[in-house]
């Protein structure tokens, strides 16, 4: 269904298990967003298998907790690592811009004028964002239709749909 990775794509493979989203988050934060202070507690977990959303970020009412939800399908082995990397980095851009975080809000709208992609480029994530966008454009909807009922069970990926 999906092509094998090229050498350029393999560059973005992380040494962290997809099950350890906290490890992914802190690796990405340390490596690409060291200029962004963590001003509250940040939790990350897999969420619903949305068809048209890869992630979300929310701030608690008392501003003490940020939650980043990641589409559960991104832990599937057919999804390239750069899609997960880019999704988490995308949510960190929102955090940095004051959406889903107590930091001052920098813009009126979170995606105005392509600000997220510009920020990802500025943080040396231009190649992964391009690869991610290409993969999403070419494979996401067919992948979703085939695997949206898929759930990892007891740490092992199983496809409920043949």
Regions found by a protein language model. Give the residues of each.
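Generic secondary-structure microfeatures
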Residues: 46-50, 72-74, 91
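Short pre-active-site segment immediately N-terminal to the catalytic Zn-binding motif
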Residues: 68-86, 101, 108-109
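Active-site beta-strand-loop-beta-strand hairpin of nuclease catalytic cores
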Residues: 61-66
């Amino acid at each position: 269904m999906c092509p094998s990775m090229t050498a350029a794509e393999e560059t973005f493979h992380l040494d962290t298990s997809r099950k350890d989203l906290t490890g992914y988050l802190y690796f990405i934060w340390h490596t690409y967003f060291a200029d962004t202070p963590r001003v509250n507690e940040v939790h990350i977990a897999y969420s619903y298998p949305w068809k048209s959303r890869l992630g979300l970020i929310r701030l608690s009412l008392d501003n003490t907790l940020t939650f980043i939800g990641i589409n559960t399908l991104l832990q599937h082995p057919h999804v390239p690592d750069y899609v997960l990397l880019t999704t988490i980095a995308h949510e960190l851009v929102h955090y940095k811009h004051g959406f889903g975080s107590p930091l001052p809000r920098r813009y009126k709208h979170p995606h105005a004028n392509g600000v997220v992609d510009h920020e990802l480029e500025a943080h040396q994530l231009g190649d992964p964002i391009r690869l991610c966008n290409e993969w999403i454009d070419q494979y996401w909807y067919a992948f979703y239709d085939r695997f949206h009922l898929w759930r990892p069970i007891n740490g092992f990926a199983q496809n409920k749909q043949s």
